[in-house]
Amino acid sequence: MSEAVRIGDIVFLAGQIPDDLAGDIAAQTREVLDNVDAVMAELGGSKADIASIQVWLSDMADFQGMNAVWDAWVDPANPPARATCGVALARPGMRVEMIAVARAPY
């Protein structure tokens, strides 16, 4: 499975998930956002190129914990659009997954 696919000037990042499922929501969110940063860097871009992110939480009670890590990560001068939903995630212990759409770095 591809980590990201470029179509023209748009990049679609696949679902970014934590590897360490023992961590709390803050640890899992940091790991996922680090993954987003790493994929964008591989493409020659950064979080400044991200247009939108969908955040999926296995428990909406984790919203504030995820959001605190998000607020520390996001550039307040250039925040992407974001939607957050409660869903059933693929693996037990997984608390967060994110997908993103970005402009392709030039």
Language-model-detected regions and their locations in the chain:
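Short, polar/acidic, helix-capping and beta-turn segments at strand->helix junctions
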Residues: M1-Y106
